[in-house]
UniProtKB/Swiss-Prot annotation:
Organism, scientific name: Pseudomonas fluorescens (strain ATCC BAA-477 / NRRL B-23932 / Pf-5)
Protein name, as recorded: Large ribosomal subunit protein bL9
Keywords in alphabetical order: Ribonucleoprotein, Ribosomal protein, RNA-binding, rRNA-binding
Example of a GO MF term: structural constituent of ribosome
InterPro entries linked: Ribosomal_bL9, Ribosomal_bL9/RNase_H1_N, Ribosomal_bL9_bac/chp, Ribosomal_bL9_C, Ribosomal_bL9_C_sf, Ribosomal_bL9_N, Ribosomal_bL9_N_sf
Presence of keyword rRNA-binding: yes
Length: 148
């Protein structure tokens, strides 16, 4: 399935690239979320007419993500959870909990932007958590988990 990307997609291409993807990826993700459009002659002409507008919009999104990254770089978030004697949590701290704590501290973060490559946090301690704000912008936040 040939598509024209309407924004930068990690590991796929940049704005305006004509890419060939599997049909399911195109139909179920790229097209419904407005990240791409079918590569027909009419859509190519329409895209070229809107190219400057889309590039400006992409630059604004990146600038917004960079300002949020600068705010996040200064933050250290403390999350309180119940834990046993050895520091093992009863339950875990996931992306939703971290996103809520960051939003409460003043920076709007969606749970889908928080990256926990090793899974949820299950122990008391300090952790560096990656926050993926944009295809080109990633910030690291220090999360401190303390026992209640």
């Amino acid at each position: 399935m040939e598509l024209i990307l309407l924004e930068k997609i990690a590991n796929l291409g940049n704005l305006g690239d004509k890419v060939n993807v599997k049909a399911g990826y195109g139909r179920n993700y790229l097209l419904p979320f407005g990240k791409a459009t079918a590569a027909t002659a009419a859509n190519l002409a329409a895209f070229e007419a809107r190219r400057a507008e889309l590039e400006k919009l992409a630059a604004e999104k990146k600038a917004s993500a960079e300002t949020r990254a600068a705010q996040l770089a200064e933050l250290e978030v403390t999350i309180t959870a119940t834990a046993g004697d050895e520091g093992k949590l009863f339950g875990s701290i996931g992306t939703h909990d971290i996103a809520d704590a960051l939003t409460a501290s003043g920076v709007e973060v969606a749970k889908s932007e928080v990256r926990l490559p090793n899974g949820t946090i299950r122990n008391v301690g300090e952790f560096d958590v990656a926050v993926h704000l944009h295809a080109e912008v990633e910030a690291t936040v220090r999360v401190v988990v303390v026992a209640a």
